[in-house]
Swiss-Prot record:
It holds the Pfam family Transcrip_reg. It comes from Dinoroseobacter shibae (strain DSM 16493 / NCIMB 14021 / DFL 12). The keyword Transcription regulation applies. Keywords: Cytoplasm, DNA-binding, Transcription, Transcription regulation. Belongs to the TACO1 family. Its main location: cytoplasm. This is Probable transcriptional regulatory protein Dshi_2762. One of its GO terms (cellular component) is cytosol. It is found in: Cytoplasm.
Amino acid sequence: MAGHSKWANIQHRKGRQDKLRAKLFSKLSKEITVAAKMGDPDPDKNPRLRLAVKEAKSQSVPKDVIERAIKKSLGGEGENYDEIRYEGYGPGGVAVIVEAMTDNRNRTASTVRSTFSKNGGNLGETGSVSFMFERKGQVSYPAEAGDADTVMMAAIEAGAEDVESDESGHIIWCADTDLNEVSTALEAELGESESTKLVWRPTTTTELDLEGMQKLMKLLDALEDDDDVQNVTANFEASDEVMAQL
């Protein structure tokens, strides 16, 4: 996805892995609890929970943490979370979508608005930038899963819409409503995926220079550091030369 995979690489290079990992475990656990509470606590009978557990496993979340997150949903234990989407613009006019799960809407809205303002952006109304994205299913495989032709054939058979392959691996795209079915079919052909999730895929991007990217990263990192925030997506584009300097 434009912006998102590059952003993950930047975060890795910046040495934020340990801090991000702890936050990632917390965010994935929250998604499991919410998914289980909204539907059946059995992943086989609850597509959203199945995807949440699958994503947690792919990110090396321990089995006991996953089981605890599911148990938390039973018997009314744990907080009730609202799912909210915020939309706005970052430095350079980059469109930003923030997905949050919160037990206090006022707190989260205030924090997100403040984070945008302090980092050269501004929070907009719902719908102000989402028209520049499509909701899609995304399944990622490492390069060793197969060559581009093999993965393309498996993706077509599975009902996917698009495949992007390079030396780092394969990203398979499908309709958001088909993700569970497509990922299951891909597993039968290619084995376990690295990641399976619903994402916002930009349909248009904004090119940034080094200074613009540095400013944008401050905003994206600050948003990601908010415990209520689950996912942040931005439609930036930058040259390899700029990316190498971050």
